[in-house]
Amino acid sequence: CYGKSLPNGKTYKQEMLEKIPLDLSRVHFVGSLPYGLYLKVIQASDVHIYLTRPFVLSWSMIESLSTGCLIVGSDTSPVREVIEDGENGLLADFFSPKQVADRVDEVLEHPTRMAEIREKARQTVLERYALSDMLGKHLELINQVANRTLTPTIGRETKPSLTLSKF
């Protein structure tokens, strides 16, 4: 979806299935879905595994949180901006498949214990990312950039008057 095509012409799914033996009765490749059906899949999921290197945070993580789907995410800066380990999701070392698997096991083995984390995940989105709040802030940011009134912050110690991290 985001990367280059493989030089051998295979899809990443084909490449992975050739290298990793998976129980396909337990792993679902749903492909592209209409938005309403996509949300139903997330709502039916026990866990959303979100691994990313330092990059921009994907909307899929915020949407998963909004449905109360529990996130096991990589302990990387974009994920830590949203997930507080043990509060509204779980973090694992990006470079440790065992730690990721252990965190997923923790979710699946203790569904009752995870209920509060799921609720806090949803609350995080309602409190910090609600469209009714974000729209005005985004328009303000656009106006500041367009009018050149946004204080430059690169290389400065002071905090800007408006940043996306506040949202």
Regions found by a protein language model. Give the residues of each.
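Short alpha-helical segment that forms part of, or immediately flanks, the ligand-binding pocket
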Residues: 39, 58-66, 80-81, 87
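Aromatic "clamp/platform" in nucleotide-sugar-dependent glycosyltransferases that forms part
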Residues: 53
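Conserved acidic donor-binding segment of nucleotide-sugar-dependent glycosyltransferases
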Residues: 85-86, 90-97, 106-111
